[in-house]
């Protein structure tokens, strides 16, 4: 929106042409989203508390979590609003990738909203039935995957790129591309949701990964940089750097209120949306494997749940972990909540740096 206005003014006042630079708009998007979160956060928290939209806590979980009962939840709506408003302000609204990513984020957020609303307002502990949750998120992910596949006009847009090697890729075909894209978008969404169990645990790694994906998006959308670094050139993908900047800024603003002891939780409305956003960006810029590396924390949390359930059924009631997801295992092992969170952040920093190194190590 502001881009079109600035370019119009730039016809007469050349100084406004600076807003055509993606790097500037990415920084401005991050700052705008951060300020929106700061400005609106207290009011959102007060409204959630007044409506008694509070978190329910599992009786069989760590005892330290019992004090969290009643903490306002569904605060992820604040993140989504900040991302949407900022992207509409600073993004190029003629770019199809911006709209696909934004609509996927809003769609997954809507599913999470219904799930949270049923849990905390209608006092339904199950929320939205799992089959319906996966059905709706699957439909949204498939719609995005099909759109991206059908509108691809270059082979690189649907190939699986192998990091650490120059010009090593595998053609997936339409069916393979749609299947992989569905798995990445839906899988990342639910992985972030599983990770969101401690104060600040999910949001900071999400911000880190989003920041790294902003770099990948900028490189992929720049003909010169993509050629030099051996990254497939995806025309228009650079605009997703602006979206990622908005996500990172909104996430940091939310962390201000979500840091221990949390004043608000993001709920499914935030976790599902943010995970889907990361997955969609990774699909567009063809960095699914790198997302798997940088989001290793999300992968580990998900695998811990899967392994726990499978082993429990196969062994007749035995468990590998004290409790799943993985962060609860360490809590019950004696780690304080803040120790788990900060140590998992450190691991994510290492993984993100390793993921970024794939740009040069080819």
From Swiss-Prot:
Instruction: Return the PROSITE patterns for the record.
Output: MRAY_1, MRAY_2
Entry's Gene Ontology cellular component terms: plasma membrane
Top-level taxon of the source organism: Bacteria
Instruction: List the cofactors.
Output: Mg(2+)
Provide a Gene Ontology MF annotation, just one: metal ion binding
Compartmental location: Cell inner membrane
Listed EC numbers: 2.7.8.13
Catalytic activity annotation:
UDP-N-acetyl-alpha-D-muramoyl-L-alanyl-gamma-D-glutamyl-meso-2,6-diaminopimeloyl-D-alanyl-D-alanine + di-trans,octa-cis-undecaprenyl phosphate = di-trans,octa-cis-undecaprenyl diphospho-N-acetyl-alpha-D-muramoyl-L-alanyl-D-glutamyl-meso-2,6-diaminopimeloyl-D-alanyl-D-alanine + UMP
GO process annotations (BP): cell division; cell wall organization; peptidoglycan biosynthetic process; regulation of cell shape
Alphabetically ordered keywords of this record:
Cell cycle, Cell division, Cell inner membrane, Cell membrane, Cell shape, Cell wall biogenesis/degradation, Magnesium, Membrane, Metal-binding, Peptidoglycan synthesis, Transferase, Transmembrane, Transmembrane helix
Q: Give TM segment ranges.
A: 27-47, 73-93, 97-117, 132-152, 160-180, 200-220, 237-257, 264-284, 289-309, 339-359
Lipid bilayer topology: Multi-pass membrane protein
Q: In which pathway does it act?
A: Cell wall biogenesis; peptidoglycan biosynthesis
NCBIfam families named in the record: mraY (TIGR00445)
Q: Which PANTHER family match?
A: PHOSPHO-N-ACETYLMURAMOYL-PENTAPEPTIDE-TRANSFERASE, PHOSPHO-N-ACETYLMURAMOYL-PENTAPEPTIDE-TRANSFERASE HOMOLOG
Q: Per its database record, what is this protein's job?
A: Catalyzes the initial step of the lipid cycle reactions in the biosynthesis of the cell wall peptidoglycan: transfers peptidoglycan precursor phospho-MurNAc-pentapeptide from UDP-MurNAc-pentapeptide onto the lipid carrier undecaprenyl phosphate, yielding undecaprenyl-pyrophosphoryl-MurNAc-pentapeptide, known as lipid I.
Q: Which family does it belong to?
A: Belongs to the glycosyltransferase 4 family. MraY subfamily.
Q: What is this protein called?
A: Phospho-N-acetylmuramoyl-pentapeptide-transferase
